[in-house]
Amino acid sequence: MSSQMLYNTQKIRGFQHERYEFSVGKLIWHIKRRKIQCSHCGNEQVRTEVLKRRRIRGLPSGTAEVFFEFDVHRLYCPKCRKQKMEELHFLSHAKSRMTRSLERTVLELRKHMSIQALCRYFHLRWHTVKELEKEALSRKFRRIQTTHVKAIGIDEIHVGNGKENSGFLTIVRDLESGAVIHVGDDK
């Protein structure tokens, strides 16, 4: 398997195929970095330390689950004197356990399938799919344009019943478009 196959199927750049292994319903690709360089200055003369071996989930191949296994390095650059973890561009964040391409595919299919159907197809937990959806929505609505808002409406809603489980939610909306600008706890 070439590095071109890694990129074309999974959008993984800068890594090359070492070996692969099959077990029942699983394909595990062992990959390694082609060249290690400082992400800050681009220097290739860096000292590396292997911190751990990671296994992340990729897009399935047919009915087989695909996993990628690789070493994660800590880098020290003598040129810019920075010490940092290597950047993994095919992950959405440092602690992600699946590739960006798998996350994107799950989110695209979520528009047409139920969470339970996605979980069965990709062998994921329900909470994993729900968290992906929450993160995508928070990224989408992180910055709401308020420059064109001329009039707002503020609602305070009582949530819960009784004294222990009750509270208020404050909702701020654009009165013209009806878009929610802010949702906050308490009054």
Residue spans of the language-model regions?
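Short, conserved DNA-binding cores of transcription-related domains
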Residues: 1-88
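Residue-level detection of the helix-turn-helix DNA-binding "recognition helix"
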Residues: 43, 123, 134, 138
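Short, conserved catalytic/metal-binding motifs centered on acidic residues
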Residues: 38, 77, 118, 152-158
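Short, basic interhelical loop/turn and adjoining N-cap
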Residues: 116-131
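Short, Lys/Arg-enriched anionic-surface-contact patches
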Residues: 81-102
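Short, amphipathic alpha-helical "recognition" segments used to contact nucleic acids or chromatin
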Residues: 98-113
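RNase H-like nuclease fold core
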Residues: 132-187
